[in-house]
């Protein structure tokens, strides 16, 4: 059986890669993917802790986080599509205002 510390280390690495990608990239789509990677790291942490503590609370909360992440991705991609249609770019350096 894989020890809990390995799951925690993997979740931390996933979260840190997501944070690094979110802070260093200027493409909004890559920033959304990095945000999803951070949420997946948190989900892995929740599921691992829940499994090792013999509780279903972490699993249930993870389902809610996955649902919210899917909604966030859909809304975020919708906004990115609208920005690309109006400004022809998805770099956040070139977008200074959200007014249409």
From Swiss-Prot:
Record GO cellular component, one term: plasma membrane
Protein EC: 7.1.1.-
Molecular-function annotations in GO: NADH:ubiquinone reductase (non-electrogenic) activity; quinone binding
Membrane topology type: Multi-pass membrane protein
UniProt entry keywords in alphabetical sequence: Cell inner membrane, Cell membrane, Membrane, NAD, Quinone, Translocase, Transmembrane, Transmembrane helix, Transport, Ubiquinone
InterPro entries xrefs: NADH_UbQ_OxRdtase_chain4L/K (IPR001133), NUOK/Mnh_C1-like (IPR039428)
Reaction catalyzed: a quinone + NADH + 5 H(+)(in) = a quinol + NAD(+) + 4 H(+)(out)
Short name of one Pfam family: Oxidored_q2
Transmembrane annotation, as ranges: 2-22, 28-48, 64-84
Protein's cellular compartments: Cell inner membrane
GO biological process: ATP synthesis coupled electron transport
Subunit description: NDH-1 is composed of 14 different subunits. Subunits NuoA, H, J, K, L, M, N constitute the membrane sector of the complex.
Listed HAMAP family: NDH1_NuoK
Chain's role: NDH-1 shuttles electrons from NADH, via FMN and iron-sulfur (Fe-S) centers, to quinones in the respiratory chain. The immediate electron acceptor for the enzyme in this species is believed to be ubiquinone. Couples the redox reaction to proton translocation (for every two electrons transferred, four hydrogen ions are translocated across the cytoplasmic membrane), and thus conserves the redox energy in a proton gradient.
Family: Belongs to the complex I subunit 4L family.
Protein name: NADH-quinone oxidoreductase subunit K
Organism the protein comes from: Desulfovibrio desulfuricans (strain ATCC 27774 / DSM 6949 / MB)
Source taxonomy: Bacteria, Pseudomonadati, Thermodesulfobacteriota, Desulfovibrionia, Desulfovibrionales
């Amino acid at each position: 059986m894989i020890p809990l510390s390995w799951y925690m280390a993997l979740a931390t690495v996933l979260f840190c890669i997501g944070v690094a990608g979110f802070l260093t990239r200027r493409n909004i789509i890559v920033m959304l993917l990095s945000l999803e990677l951070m949420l997946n790291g948190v989900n892995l942490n929740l599921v691992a802790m829940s499994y090792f503590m013999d509780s279903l609370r972490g699993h249930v909360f993870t389902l809610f986080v996955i649902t919210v992440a899917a909604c966030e991705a859909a809304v975020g991609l919708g906004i990115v599509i609208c920005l690309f249609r109006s400004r022809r770019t998805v770099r956040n350096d070139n977008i200074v205002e959200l007014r249409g």
